[in-house]
Amino acid sequence: ISQGCKIVISTQFGFLDATINVAERHPDVAFYYLGNSDQNHDNFSVSNGQQWDPWYLCGMLAGMTSSSGSLGFVASMPVPDVMIAINSFELGAQRINADAETNVVFTGAWDDSGLATTAASQLINSGCDVIAQFQDTPKPIVDMCQSEGIPVFGCNADVMELAPDVWISAVCAD
């Protein structure tokens, strides 16, 4: 802004509040946030990829893969992007198996391997026979699923090489 920019694009999750704060102080600059928000300002707008479609398709695959209809989802936090993923995944699974249920464990963190592993273990031990995840650290979940023979879905990274026997797919922005 100090260099004369009239458009600012904020691309990082977690920058929403800061972007809105700066937008309110600079009404002559247009701010564009890549994410979800219900905030509305004359110089502030949001956009997010339509991730519900690929999550719905992954849910359909999960519905075809699961023998029990009990699906697990390791999620970071109940923020809009994550909730869209969970709901779309479950609706897709229910398209195939009307009785499918998605059991969710929120870790409260994006990148805590220990919490992610604990959450995946909890879901598997409760009878979930397919696991999906929305975490920034997929490796511990994928490794656990590979060792347990549990089909797994990912988010934002194709890590098929880590779990060639159980990897199904991932939702990745391209």
Regions from the language model: what does each represent?
Residues I1-D174:
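A residue-level marker of the well-folded mature domains of exported/periplasmic proteins
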